[in-house]
Amino acid sequence: MPSRNSINRPKLTVNLNRKNSSISKKRDQRERAGLLQPARSSADSKSGKVKSVPLDLYFEGQKDDHASAKGITNKTLSKKRAKKIERNIKYAQQRRLLTDATAKLEADMEIDIDQKKTKDAKPKTALEQVKEALWNAVEDTSNSGLIIENGQGTVLGGPYFP
């Protein structure tokens, strides 16, 4: 019989069939043992989520994403790891509070600016309206943009030989 890496052998189909059959046997064995419950499409499935045994142990009694499906486990959670998880949860709550507070502050600031404009709005005299129109025209001409002249000595203007 030729070796596994021999040239004159239909390797691909044989190897793929063997691999697929062994995978299906393993999957059937896991299903019979009840290890594939719940299904991956189920909402209770942890498929695609980060697997963390310490978090599962920490949140075991709570109804949460980390709640463990099994009640009995052979793993324990050390006191040091439990304190670390509690500390990280506390930091996450503080970050959430901080972001909420800053978002609220920014929203309040926008409202305050609008209120100041409405409070400060007084009826303008004709002279003030003319002054404002003239200053707006001056600002528009001064902010017209960058004007590049076609002078000597610039890259755009051509060569410069001193």
Swiss-Prot record:
Xref: InterPro entries: Ribosome_bgen_Alb1
This protein's record includes keyword rRNA processing: no
Its biological purpose: Involved in proper assembly of pre-ribosomal particles during the biogenesis of the 60S ribosomal subunit. Accompanies the pre-60S particles to the cytoplasm.
UniProt KW Transport keyword: yes
This protein's UniProt keywords: Cytoplasm, Nucleus, Ribosome biogenesis, Transport
Organism name: Candida glabrata (strain ATCC 2001 / BCRC 20586 / JCM 3761 / NBRC 0622 / NRRL Y-65 / CBS 138)
Subunit details: Component of the nucleoplasmic and cytoplasmic pre-60S ribosomal particles.
Family statement drawn from the similarity comment of this UniProt entry: Belongs to the ALB1 family.
Renumbered residue ranges of the record's region Disordered: 1-50
One Pfam entry name: Alb1
GO annotation terms (biological process): ribosomal large subunit biogenesis
Compartment(s) of residence: Cytoplasm; Nucleus
Identification of the protein by name: Ribosome biogenesis protein ALB1
Cellular component per GO, a single term: nucleus
Biased composition range(s): Polar residues: 1-23
